[in-house]
Amino acid sequence: MSELLSLQETLYTSRNPTRRWLHRTRRARIEETLRLAAATAGSGRALEVGPGSGVYLPLLCQLFDDVVASDVEEAFLANARELAGTHPNLRPVADDITASGLPAQSFDVVLCSEVIEHIEDSEGALRAMHGLLRPGGLLVLSTPQRHSPLELAGRIAFLPGIVTFVRAVYREPILATGHINLLTAPEARRQLAGAGFDVLESGQSGVYLPLVAEFTGRIGLKLEQWIERRMIGGRLSGLLWVQYYLARA
């Protein structure tokens, strides 16, 4: 698990321009949406489901009076407890969102970023999040898109003999994603609606071009950014890496 923490911390400072851009873009989008959610739903209580390395917890603690970080992994909870030492309004708790013991209708905002792809019953998890929100509360959600080339490459990378080459190219932590439930945008919208949410805003980001990302540096990144601008909102937007939602309970 310490390897996973190391990986998550490396993503935002990666030596590889594309890897760094993909994750920083997602972080910026989530942070922007959290600020909007706090301004809309109020600055009372927030929950982050699956905080991982805790990249969003400091901002949540700035925006909200009381922040709960729930996870099932002790390493991530230990990391959150360290953060709580400097953020007294942060409370880490061991909780499984698929069988949550948190009080119903007790949060103004729930953040769930890059989590539901690890959960087989993602709609059940979304229903649980809906139940934790006060009426009119907001969910900030992100999850990878099923047909993203990056997700396909992530599976290919761990075929026998390939992962050694990939690690040699990146010279950084490379671990299997653990993504067992990738959704298309229509599927994600259906699950959100089925859980009782109304989508207020949505979007996508992130182009990954195999080999271009690994071997052409900043020149390749500029090409990926150019392609991304032309894909957003178009017929090929399902190939972008991450989908984002701001939804009301």
What are these regions (language model features)?
Residues R24-S43:
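Conserved alpha-helix/loop element of class I SAM-dependent methyltransferases that forms part
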Residues S53-F64:
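Conserved SAM-binding loop of SAM-dependent methyltransferases across substrates and taxa
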Residues C112-V115:
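A short beta-strand submotif of the Rossmann-like class I SAM-dependent methyltransferase core
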Residues D66-D71:
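Conserved SAM-binding motif I beta-strand of class I
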Residues T98-V109:
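A short acidic, Gly/Pro-enriched loop at the edge of an enzyme's catalytic core
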Residues T86-A99:
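Conserved SAM-binding strand-loop segment of SAM-dependent methyltransferases
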Residues S43-G52:
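Conserved class I S-adenosyl-L-methionine
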